[in-house]
């Protein structure tokens, strides 16, 4: 008896070509509302994590695995840092503003962290640093704290916040691409949720 192989119709991913579940960035007033509330409650770790998440624009997997040596030289917090991204295996550079440096310095001093220590260590015994899941829960608490619906926000909210503000001010897609560490400009266009025609028009006007 001849057996024929069972041919299956190739499945197309349900979300192919669609922008599904994009998490909105925080508005400037929301950034300050969260920051001030955390400062009033003397939540040193949260202030440092919040500020660095905004400045660095890193994916959660890269943010939670940062070590002190990645952002500091001895006792001095660097104004700029560079890491190798886990997803793309490519380097990305980010700025650390003065208020973020101050909050990080305060946190490191409070915890007496060494250069080889993880910047945000976990309280759990099975992990040396906070997990991406823990970080996501923290982000949800931040937005809930100022009355926002936490189901609409996530860790990508933190990654998108500063680049969205920069984009609205400059319309410079190439700069945003570099800041996010994207290899393709198309990825940046989709990440920001920009209309393709508008994006291409602006990209044509951007000298790189």
Model-found features: residue ranges?
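Conserved catalytic core of the tyrosine transesterase superfamily
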Residues: 1-208
């Amino acid at each position: 008896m001849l057996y024929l192989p069972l041919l299956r119709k190739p499945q197309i991913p349900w979300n192919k070509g669609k922008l599904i579940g994009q998490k909105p960035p925080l508005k400037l007033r929301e950034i300050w509302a969260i920051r001030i509330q955390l400062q009033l409650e003397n939540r040193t770790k949260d202030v440092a994590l919040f500020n660095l998440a905004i400045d660095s624009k890193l994916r959660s997997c890269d943010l939670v695995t940062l070590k002190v040596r990645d952002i500091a030289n001895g006792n001095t917090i660097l104004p700029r840092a560079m890491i190798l991204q886990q997803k793309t295996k490519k380097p990305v550079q980010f700025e650390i503003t003065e208020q973020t440096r101050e909050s990080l310095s305060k946190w490191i001093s409070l915890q007496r962290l060494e250069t080889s220590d993880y910047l945000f260590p976990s309280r759990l015994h099975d992990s040396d640093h906070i997990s991406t899941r823990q970080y996501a829960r923290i982000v949800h608490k931040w937005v809930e704290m100022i009355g926002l619906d936490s189901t609409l926000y996530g860790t990508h909210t933190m990654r998108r916040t500063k680049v969205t503000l920069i984009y609205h001010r400059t319309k410079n897609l190439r700069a945003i691409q570099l800041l996010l560490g994207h290899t393709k400009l198309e990825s940046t266009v989709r990440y920001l949720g920009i209309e393709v025609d508008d994006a291409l028009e602006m990209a044509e006007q951007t000298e790189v």
